């Protein structure tokens, strides 16, 4: 998968206010590992040329965990809370200017995303020669989630954050 080049950006800057917890959302445990630990295990299995992790809320706690568990991760501090787009923008500014490949952006709080799904996503993106590719799911009850709104042609019309 690394023939063209791939970097991964993990979004871990959010505060997780809906969880009503003093613990950052990505640091909650699932099956003996933090949510971000599950995500990082998957991200580092993709043979990227770098995994960039965007931090803001309680960044010291998350940074300490990453430094111990994933020392090769490149930590990027988000300067202002301005949504997912700003988090991606900040991370892109840290990727070397001469990088000529694809950027895979994943959420740090989606622990069940597996290597094969992401490998297939990157392959579909590359075979379709797309500018951008978004992995989506159809949910019976999408309340509580951001949404991808599609046009009548099935293409993305807009993204609505929760």
At which residue positions do the language-model features occur?
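N-terminal nucleotide-binding beta1-loop-alpha1 segment
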Residues: 1-21
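Conserved N-terminal catalytic core of the sugar/cofactor nucleotidyltransferase
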Residues: 1-7, 33-123, 127, 150
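Short beta-strand/turn micro-motifs composed of small residues
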Residues: 12, 55, 107, 136-137
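Conserved G/P- and acidic residue-centered "switch" motifs that form tight phosphate/ATP-binding loops
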Residues: 14, 25, 109
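Short glycine-enriched, charge-decorated loop/helix-capping segments at active-site entrances
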Residues: 23-29
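Conserved beta-strand segments of alpha/beta enzyme cores
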Residues: 26, 72-74, 155
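Conserved beta-strand scaffold positions in the cores of enzyme catalytic domains, especially
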Residues: 27, 75, 132-134
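Conserved core of the sugar-phosphate nucleotidyltransferase
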Residues: 113-162
